[in-house]
């Protein structure tokens, strides 16, 4: 009796993989990042004072890398700032915890954006 050759599992075709993340996704992620940064900026200054410009400075770097989205990014930053300002009028442990959560969320978004850049020639 002859042995049948083993069949290799078929690899999914390129078209069966998840669709490439397009410009709309990218723009949405940038806006979400700007909202997160705006919120984190407010929370940081309400707790540590106006001299702490860490998240505003980071936002400026994003805008410098993506100047075509300047208006959207500034609007998002300001919206995030106002949202957190309405929720956290004073600094307490909850305020500090929310800033840490926003920092983690912003990091996840930034990593996703970097992964997109790493997979393309867009820089």
Each model region followed by its residue ranges:
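Generic signal for short, ordered secondary-structure residues
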Residues: 15-16, 38, 85, 92
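Short N-proximal segments of mature Sec-exported proteins
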Residues: 17-72, 76-80
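Compact alpha-helical subdomains of small soluble proteins
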Residues: 52-123
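Compositionally biased, proline/threonine/alanine/serine-rich low-complexity intrinsically disordered stretches
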Residues: 1-25, 118-123
